[in-house]
Amino acid sequence: MITLSAEQCRIIGVMLEKETTTPEQYPLSLNGITTGCNQKSNRDPVMSLSESDVQNLVDELVQMNQLMVDQKASTRVNKYFHRFCDTEFGNLKFTPQQRAVICVLFLRGPQTPGELRTRTNRLADFADVSEVDNTLTQLQDLNGLTLVRKLEREPGKRESRYVHLLSDVDESSFTQAVTTQTEVVLSEEQTSLTQRVTELEQQVASLTEQINCITELLNDD
């Protein structure tokens, strides 16, 4: 199974997305790939790759047989199509639903089944979240390949997220990020509670002092 960098995943995700949503613009030029990579909507994280960065990444993917130059293009500008999946001699054969899930995981990072159902709406049809669950189960053992994995559920969340396993990104970083967020929340809550206790202690001390003063006045009378 191939291992891709986060930037290479972004490029292939863009190719998969545009092939389905704007087939009239596919194969893509270098400019089209760059624009798709740096798109602010439907991307996480948002990237700022230069055209030269993208050219280097495209060249790497061509060497890996994941992209090819379209020799049939009638323009002077090179256009590229992917060979990542669903090719005659490739190992990865996806259903439209499996392909849509992988595409969104490439473009947006870890997702819950509910998020995947919403965010694949232009790529494939899912009747309900259970169909997404079934697709994720299939991708966990697709012809002997484990392409996605379920992450630990985040505190306060109803669903666990899933991450694809075709990247060299460390999965533990997602768990660490969740742990850090939880620690920050707990720290903020603890600080707020401490401040509240201090305020109450000050109020009690003030009331006690007032009561003592009143008691002294009554005793003097």
Curated annotation (Swiss-Prot):
Coiled coil: none annotated. Disulfide bonds: none annotated. It comes from the Bacteria. SUPFAM superfamilies: Winged helix' DNA-binding domain. InterPro entries: DUF480, WH-like_DNA-bd_sf, WH_DNA-bd_sf. It holds the Pfam family DUF480. Belongs to the UPF0502 family. This is UPF0502 protein CPS_0106.
